[in-house]
Regions:
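A short, Lys/Arg-rich alpha-helix, primarily the initiator
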Residues: 1-23
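Conserved hydrophobic/aromatic packing and binding residues within compact polymer-binding modules
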Residues: 17, 31-32, 42-45, 71
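Recognition helix of helix-turn-helix/homeodomain-like DNA-binding domains
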Residues: 36-50
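Short, basic-rich loop-to-helix N-cap that marks the start of a DNA-contacting helix
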Residues: 49-62
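Short C-terminal boundary/hinge segments that cap the last helix of small helical domains
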Residues: 65-74
Length: 74
């Protein structure tokens, strides 16, 4: 069960991923390809509709060409 505090954190993480993707001028499709994850999975992450695993977060960071810790700078 996800409580309100966790939900806010998941949404903030998704917003950070979207912000970084847009800074890099990447489409969701391109970032998903670079991250080697499904486009729908990336969409759910950005919308804050899923709690991503550490491996998913790591894949997204790799796709963005950033260290994993950058995704948590929010």
């Amino acid at each position: 069960m996800i409580n309100n505090k966790d939900e806010a954190l998941i949404k903030a993480f998704g917003a950070r991923v979207r912000e970084l993707r847009k800074q890099k001028l990447l489409s969701m499709e391109k970032l998903a390809e670079l991250s080697e994850i499904d486009y729908r999975q990336l969409s759910y992450v950005e919308l804050g509709d899923t709690n991503p695993t550490i491996s998913t977060a790591s894949a997204i960071a790799k796709g963005l060409g950033l260290p994993l810790k950058e995704l948590f700078d929010f």
